[in-house]
């Protein structure tokens, strides 16, 4: 609790500083083709992961790193790379600010019409009260500002009509039915019940679960002291461990879990009720230099192998992370 209070104080202090920067001029992003990056294999399909981007959208000094990453993705798409999804792990803003959503919109709209760019809602995408608590889930402007980016998402199911916090986006990986299940920060019990019904009634489909808070910076599944527990008020919520027990563990067609929120990169493998190891992955940009420094996570899905190869890559320096927690594989068929 002491750590939480110190972290909350630091966040509120940063918020005050950020408010003083409201007159920042963000560079206008443009797209131009750059050379093919040989990190890609034309015979594979890819999922690209953006972590939490609130530093990119909140500071004009960092925005060029975001723009460079977007342009790199666009260029590889032009070079014929099969990018199936771009996944964003929440915290688009610091405190639900319209200006930051607009920056995110401006930068991601450039490629959203070519590649589904799917985001989940983070704890910083809600409005806080003076105690640093979230007293109204519906305070988030997430749906309002993400809807334009979602025009080409083939949404198969909504928990609530036309709200994007809890949805299923249908798709394919290597000609197999693979869907993205997006869940809100600290999912309510009724949201988990909806997800259970949908996943259980679609056993012919496989799901990648995208939600904001799940692992610690050390790669442990969060049980007690989650930010959902500490911040959400006037609503039910679930801790990551409860989400595992109530939804993920007993549905073998949930392939993996992707989150952000903490640290930089981590992963955990846990056996579900069938004995299959479920990959749980964390990728978060906010604590990196320059708001993210051009880092991205690459998931390579080869046609001729049964495992997804995950690597952490810097799109500006064109180098892989040397940290072994950022490189691993898990089976997808």
Annotate each PLM feature.
Residues 21-100:
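N-terminal active-site segment of His-dependent metallophosphoesterases
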Residues 48-70, 94-96, 130-155, 218-236:
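Acidic/histidine-rich helix-loop elements
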Residues 98-194, 201-202, 267-283, 295-300, ...:
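Extended active-site neighborhood of metal-dependent phosphoesterases/phosphodiesterases
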Residues 119, 234-303:
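Conserved beta-sheet core of the metallophosphoesterase superfamily
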Residues 193, 200-254:
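Active-site-proximal segments of metal-dependent phosphoesterases and phosphodiesterases across multiple
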Residues 290, 297-333:
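A short C-terminal boundary segment appended to hydrolase-like catalytic domains
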């Amino acid at each position: 609790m002491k750590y939480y209070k110190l972290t909350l104080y630091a966040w509120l202090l940063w918020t005050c500083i950020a408010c003083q920067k409201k007159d920042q001029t963000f560079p206008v992003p443009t797209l131009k083709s750059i050379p093919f990056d040989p990190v890609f294999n034309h015979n594979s399909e890819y999922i690209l992961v953006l972590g939490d981007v609130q530093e990119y959208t909140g500071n004009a000094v960092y925005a060029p790193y975001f723009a460079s990453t977007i342009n790199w993705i666009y260029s590889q798409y032009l070079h014929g790379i099969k990018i199936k999804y771009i996944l964003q792990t929440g915290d688009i803003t610091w405190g639900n600010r319209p200006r930051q959503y607009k920056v995110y919109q401006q930068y991601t709209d450039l490629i959203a019409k070519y590649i589904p760019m799917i985001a989940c809602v983070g704890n910083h995408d809600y409005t806080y009260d003076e105690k640093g608590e979230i007293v109204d889930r519906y305070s988030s402007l997430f749906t309002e500002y993400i809807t334009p980016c979602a025009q080409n998402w083939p949404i198969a199911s909504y928990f609530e009509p036309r709200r994007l916090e809890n949805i299923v986006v249908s798709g394919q990986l290597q000609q197999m039915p693979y869907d993205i299940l997006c869940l809100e920060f600290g999912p309510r019990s009724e949201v988990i019940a909806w997800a259970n019904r949908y996943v259980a009634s679609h056993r012919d489909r496989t799901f990648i679960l995208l939600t904001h808070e799940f692992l610690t910076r050390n790669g442990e599944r969060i049980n007690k002291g989650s930010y959902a527990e500490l911040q959400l008020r006037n609503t039910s919520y679930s801790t990551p461990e409860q989400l595992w027990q109530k939804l993920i563990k007993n549905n073998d067609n949930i392939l993996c879990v992707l989150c952000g929120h903490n640290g930089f990169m981590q992963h955990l493998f846990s056996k579900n009720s069938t004995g299959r190891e479920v990959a749980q992955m964390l990728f978060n940009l906010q604590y990196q230099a320059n708001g993210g420094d051009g880092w991205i996570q690459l998931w390579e899905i080869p046609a001729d192998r049964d495992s997804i190869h995950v690597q952490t890559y810097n799109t500006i320096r064109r180098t892989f992370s040397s940290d072994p927690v950022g490189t691993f594989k898990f089976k997808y068929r």
